[in-house]
Design a protein with these regions (language model features):
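Glycine/threonine-rich flexible loop motifs
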Residues: 1, 9, 157-167
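Short, acidic/turn-prone active-site loops that include or flank metal/cofactor-
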Residues: 12-15, 35-37, 116-117, 137-139, ...
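Short amphipathic alpha-helical segments and helix-helix/interface helices
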Residues: 20-21, 100, 120, 167-170
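Short Asp/Glu-rich motifs
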Residues: 41-43, 122-123, 129, 164
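Short low-complexity, flexible loop/linker segments enriched in glycine and/or proline
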Residues: 45-49, 125-129, 169
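Glycine-rich phosphate/diphosphate-binding loop of Rossmann-like nucleotide-binding domains
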Residues: 68-156
């Protein structure tokens, strides 16, 4: 690493503090894909990584749902003669859509909660019929939690917020 080097990549500085300190110490210019905002306030370079994160998140649920990892042992996939698992996803952005695509492709019953009617309509056109869309509010979330096998948080959350979407008592 040398002074003046320009690094243009996914940096995720909050999650990689030591790396960030090294970049700063060596006077390297770091441009993080995930922090680039377009004129509409969107994060265009974060979109593909977010979709991958959603798909990878569901794959992680498959993995950690196994009893050897402390999970329930439910296979998060449709199997004849067994109750279809329910996957609830909070957020209908790129991450939520990626998670929903992966979960739905295995025949799960998928529910997405979001506050944006337009984004849900757009997602509805992309996703299969085993995906249900609900307005995200406390009442709907609590109803969904009753029979959810996997709950995925797929929303961009302001780092300064101190409130929660789901509480232990839920």
């Amino acid at each position: 690493l040398r002074e003046g080097l320009i690094v243009f990549t996914y940096i995720h500085s909050n999650a990689h503090l030591e790396m960030t300190k090294e970049l700063l110490k060596n006077k390297i210019i770091g441009i993080a894909y995930e922090d680039i905002i377009d004129k509409n306030g969107k994060f265009p370079l974060l979109s593909p990584m977010s979709e991958l994160a959603g798909k990878g998140g569901f794959l992680a649920a498959l993995h950690y749902g196994q009893t050897i990892y402390g999970g329930t042992g439910v296979l998060f996939s449709r199997v004849t003669g067994v109750n279809t698992p329910v996957i609830t996803i909070i957020g209908c952005g790129h991450t939520g859509i990626g998670a929903a695509e992966m979960a739905a492709s295995l025949g799960n019953r998928v529910r997405i909660l979001d506050i944006g009617k337009e984004v849900m309509e757009e997602a509805k056109a992309k996703l299969p019929s085993n995906v249900e869309f609900l307005y995200s509010n406390r009442t709907n979330l609590l109803k969904c939690l009753k029979d959810t096998d996997v709950l995925m948080n797929c929303i961009l959350w302001d780092k300064t917020r101190k409130d929660h979407l789901v509480y232990k008592d839920d």
